[in-house]
């Protein structure tokens, strides 16, 4: 989770706050089940090439009994009737770690399908984490990845991390550090995550902790024998974090090339780094996950909302200093200096997704100088060791049978990790066949949606021309106000018809109000629902673009387009708005949709705080 260059902040489920304000629901934790009756979680895998988390073993057997690895060797003898799996020519790996995620909904189920058996969450709702732990302890979470979490992060009032709709405490003074950390541990945090980030990498300015506060929090975590990790996006804050004795960095910077002494400094302090190259790439305007959607080894298991998010990237602002080459260079230098590198994705930010994105992260780590085997280490034994999870991350007797079987040899081609044959969590096999069937069913439903009739009255494409003296729309549920009030914000908006529209027309829709600084991700604007009710999908696939006229007051404005297949996370287009009327056309293709399941169009103001007023006219789909 990092500040982005155009949408002000990367998201956990961030933009779903907007959908909540207009009545949309999001996916929630699905009830898990224990192992099916008769599933003993006992079997033997024979003749596999085994990467045991440290080295490769040729033609090796691995026996599993009641969810634990029993023996690793050759020609193992097992009890009569034991299930045997021939893995000749295949590679058996420890289940993978994703060492930087933000977890909610069905993320852990999704992760397991792609071979991730443990997620290290770096900020989520601690109540969600507690529910997962409860299920895990009861043996009811076998078909979802295991979870460790930082819970609530450490930030300042109005700092990064306060913008996601969760009411979280903030730190006001170094003197409060110990009590603050103790409160997080009482909530169940497994480690402490700190935000040291002022937005300067992308030309923004937000409040952040002081270096003294960062050092105090790190010391407080160490007093309780807990790791303290730090979110950074610039080399300046990365260096400051290490000097303050952070155990690790959960991002790498992109603003400048690494200084000659930076890697040595990190090594000297025995720190580790989770670079999150996938989201770093996405932050520069490149959809890091697009190649995953195109990969036939993965695509049958990727549902439509996930595919849509993987194809997204953060629009790049001119003032951004982010350069992906700097991130690669920093990882290369850190690795050469012997700094432990951990694979993490920052899912589910744009360009990423739970589970599947770890395979892109491994590929990028190899691009940054790790060998394929070293990349495998970064997702197995290294995070297990660093985070003290000594019951996993390797294939050895007595450890959890968290396993990933792939066709081919990932030690020579890291993309082989995508060619998944089977995944087990504590010996229970993940339901990949069921997941594939669900995706296929969804594709059929999408095809049916594309064949459904468009909304009545939409044939001409005209949404509103405001020539009748009202704010009415020609089809759909019409226009409504959307603000950040349901996310704890205090922004306001009003929509009304006013005379004198674009090109001398009779009228237009005026949107005015106030952007508050009560939450960091503030919004207020006008929302159009093309379906008969808010967020009801409408088939508008016969249209290819949105055309409209707009004028404003010099503030930044955005167009957000929502689709059902986009998982209710919108595509975002910055709008160059002046005080003069201007016609703008935005192609559906630029928004990552074909229009078959359009659920909403939002014209919105954002930061900085203050009053705003803009107008739109002659809005149409064409």
Predicted ranges, named:
Residues 33-37, 50-61, 74, 353-356, ...:
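Acidic, glycine-enriched loop/beta-strand segments at the rims
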Residues 95-103, 162-179:
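Active-site mouth loops of central-metabolism enzymes
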Residues 141-145, 150-152, 207-230, 275:
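Alpha-helix-loop-beta-strand connector modules within alpha/beta enzyme cores
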Residues 179-204, 253-368, 438-443:
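Active-site neighborhoods of metal-dependent hydrolases
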Residues 451-622:
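Beta-rich carbohydrate-recognition modules and glycan-binding surfaces
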């Amino acid at each position: 989770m990092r500040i982005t260059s155009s949408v002000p902040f990367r998201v956990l489920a961030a933009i779903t706050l907007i959908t909540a304000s207009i009545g949309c629901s999001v996916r929630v934790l699905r009830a898990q089940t224990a192992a099916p009756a008769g599933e003993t979680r006992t079997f033997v895998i024979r003749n596999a090439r085994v990467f045991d988390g440290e080295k490769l073993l040729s033609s090796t057997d691995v026996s599993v009994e009641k969810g634990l690895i029993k023996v690793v060797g050759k020609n193992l003898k097992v009890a009569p009737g034991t299930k045997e799996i021939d893995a000749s020519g295949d590679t058996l790996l420890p289940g993978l770690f994703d060492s930087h995620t933000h977890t909610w909904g069905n993320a852990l189920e999704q992760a397991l399908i792609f071979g991730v058996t443990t997620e290290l969450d770096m900020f989520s709702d601690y109540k969600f984490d507690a529910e997962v732990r409860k299920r895990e302890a009861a043996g009811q979470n076998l078909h979802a990845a295991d979870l460790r979490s930082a819970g609530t992060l450490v930030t300042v009032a109005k700092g990064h991390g306060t913008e996601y709709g969760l009411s979280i405490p903030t730190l006001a003074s170094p003197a409060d550090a110990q009590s603050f950390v103790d409160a997080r541990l009482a909530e169940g945090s497994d480690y402490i995550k700190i935000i040291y980030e002022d937005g300067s990498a992308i030309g923004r300015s937000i409040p952040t902790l002081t270096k003294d506060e960062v050092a105090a929090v790190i010391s407080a975590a160490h007093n309780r024998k807990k790791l303290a990790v730090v979110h950074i996006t610039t080399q300046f804050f990365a260096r400051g974090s290490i000097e303050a004795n952070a155990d690790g960095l959960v991002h790498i910077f992109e603003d400048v090339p690494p200084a000659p002494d930076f890697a040595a400094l990190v090594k000297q302090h025995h720190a580790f780094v989770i670079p999150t190259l996938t989201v770093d790439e996405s932050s520069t305007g490149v959809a890091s996950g697009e190649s995953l959607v195109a990969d036939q080894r993965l695509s049958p298991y990727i549902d439509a909302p996930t595919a849509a998010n993987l194809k997204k990237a953060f629009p790049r602002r001119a003032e951004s200093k982010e350069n992906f080459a700097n991130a690669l260079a920093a990882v290369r230098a850190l690795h050469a200096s012997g700094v432990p590198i951990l694979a993490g994705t920052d899912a589910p930010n744009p360009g990423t997704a739970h589970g599947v994105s770890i395979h892109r992260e491994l590929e990028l780590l190899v691009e940054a100088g790790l060998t394929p085997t070293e990349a495998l280490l970064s997702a197995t034994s290294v995070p297990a060791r660093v985070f003290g999870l000594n019951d996993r991350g390797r294939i050895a007797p007595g450890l959890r049978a968290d396993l990933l079987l792939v066709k081919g040899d990932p030690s020579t081609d890291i993309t082989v990790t995508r060619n998944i044959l089977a995944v087990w969590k504590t010996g229970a096999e993940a339901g990949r066949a069921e997941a594939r069937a669900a995706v296929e069913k969804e594709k059929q439903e999408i095809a049916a949606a594309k064949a459904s009739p468009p909304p009545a009255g939409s044939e001409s494409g005209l949404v509103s021309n405001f020539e009748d003296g009202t704010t009415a729309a020609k089809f759909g549920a019409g226009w409504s106000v959307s603000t950040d009030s349901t996310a704890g914000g205090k922004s306001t908006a009003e929509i009304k018809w006013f005379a004198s529209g674009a090109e001398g027309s009779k009228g237009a829709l005026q949107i005015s109000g106030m952007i508050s600084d009560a939450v960091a991700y503030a919004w207020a604007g006008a929302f159009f629902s093309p379906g008969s009710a808010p967020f009801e999908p409408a088939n508008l696939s016969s249209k290819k673009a949105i055309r409209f006229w707009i004028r404003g007051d010099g503030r930044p404005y955005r167009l957000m387009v929502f689709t059902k297949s986009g998982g209710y996370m919108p595509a975002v287009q910055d709008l160059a708005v002046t005080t003069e009327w201007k016609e703008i056309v935005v192609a559906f293709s630029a928004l990552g949709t074909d229009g078959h399941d359009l659920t909403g169009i939002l014209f919105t103001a954002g930061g900085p705080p203050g009053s705003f007023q803009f107008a739109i006219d002659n809005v149409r789909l064409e």
